């Protein structure tokens, strides 16, 4: 389980019992690394995973929170460095750096995705009392080897909620990495990403 520490300068606040009871619990963590500007030597991958029959198994805020927290947890455990992510109602994308080269890097990727799918499906089927229900259809990955392709795919994933018409500004969608890159990347880096056109990118995204 990933824990997010408070700043040492944060002040502890006390809440009345009434306010504490009314507070809605949401996932508020974020990725613990800053954005990288270069391709990773071991391997850079873009991954897309889709729900079975494109059903909206992640439509609730809570399930998107759970899925994103699990992605962060697995990436940290397997030493992957996430560079972009977007979790939507029936699919997800992420771009990440593998810690391993060649076939070992691909195997590490398969481990992350299989655990994402296995653990989330088991939990949601238990919650819904639907043992054995198929949640995930498949996943698609691409090994990115060119810098321009890397930047274009980062832009695509950062802004994916806009592509699907969920928000006008992806920074307002908490289950994607747009606000993270704006807060942690340099203004020059963000400007460079925004200059890329993504309409010709070949990505499985018909969800």
Feature-to-residue mapping (PLM):
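Short catalytic/metal-binding and nucleic-acid-binding patches
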Residues: 1-207
């Amino acid at each position: 389980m990933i824990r997010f520490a408070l700043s040492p300068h944060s002040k502890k606040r006390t809440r009345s019992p009434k306010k504490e009871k009314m507070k809605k619990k949401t996932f508020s963590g974020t990725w613990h690394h800053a954005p990288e500007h270069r391709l990773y030597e071991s391997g850079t991958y873009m991954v897309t995973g889709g729900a079975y029959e494109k059903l909206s198994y992640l439509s609730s805020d809570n399930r998107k929170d759970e899925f994103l927290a699990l992605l962060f947890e697995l990436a940290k455990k397997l030493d992957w460095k996430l560079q972009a992510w977007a979790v939507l109602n029936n699919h997800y994308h992420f771009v990440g750096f593998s810690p391993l080269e060649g076939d070992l890097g691909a195997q590490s990727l398969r481990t992350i995705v299989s655990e994402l799918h296995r653990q989330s499906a088991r939990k949601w089927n238990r919650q819904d009392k639907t043992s054995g229900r198929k949640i995930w259809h498949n996943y698609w990955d691409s090994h990115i080897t060119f810098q321009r392709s890397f930047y274009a795919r980062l832009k695509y994933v950062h802004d994916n909620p806009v592509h699907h018409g969920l928000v006008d500004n992806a920074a307002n969608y908490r289950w994607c990495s747009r606000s993270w890159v704006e807060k942690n990347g340099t203004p020059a880096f963000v400007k460079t990403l925004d200059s890329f056109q993504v309409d010709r990118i070949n990505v499985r995204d018909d969800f």
